[in-house]
Amino acid sequence: MAKPAARTRKKVKKTVVDGIAHIHASFNNTIVTITDRQGNALSWATSGGSGFRGSRKSTPFAAQIAAERAGQAALEYGLKNLDVNVKGPGPGRESAVRALNACGYKIASITDVTPIPHNGCRPPKKRRV
């Protein structure tokens, strides 16, 4: 006797109105993660994952493309308002924020959460080019 087909419930997408965009801009790459208020990730994108390799990963344009990809993916959740947390000294900081603004999000606040050591680890030696 054949078993009856198991019914699967349709997965319901949750709707989130307010979210947080975490932008981690290092010297080598830019990572953009959009979360809800509790910190659950809704979408993310990186410069390297957006098709840029090598030194082109660390450009402001690559950060802009990564922010656009993360922003478009998070629009499916009904996201409207964003708080932006920017971390790191990289070149993609500002262009990523501008790209999120261009996606149609209302940016409520921009916060710099770059960790600053109280004389912790020794920094890398300066480059001689």
From Swiss-Prot:
It comes from the Bacteria. Gene3D superfamilies: Ribosomal protein S11. GO terms for biological process: translation. SUPFAM superfamilies: Translational machinery components. One of its GO terms (cellular component) is ribonucleoprotein complex. One of its GO terms (molecular function) is structural constituent of ribosome. NCBIfam families: PRK05309.1 (NF003698), uS11_bact (TIGR03632). Belongs to the universal ribosomal protein uS11 family. Located on the platform of the 30S subunit, it bridges several disparate RNA helices of the 16S rRNA. Forms part of the Shine-Dalgarno cleft in the 70S ribosome. Part of the 30S ribosomal subunit. Interacts with proteins S7 and S18. Binds to IF-3. This is Small ribosomal subunit protein uS11.
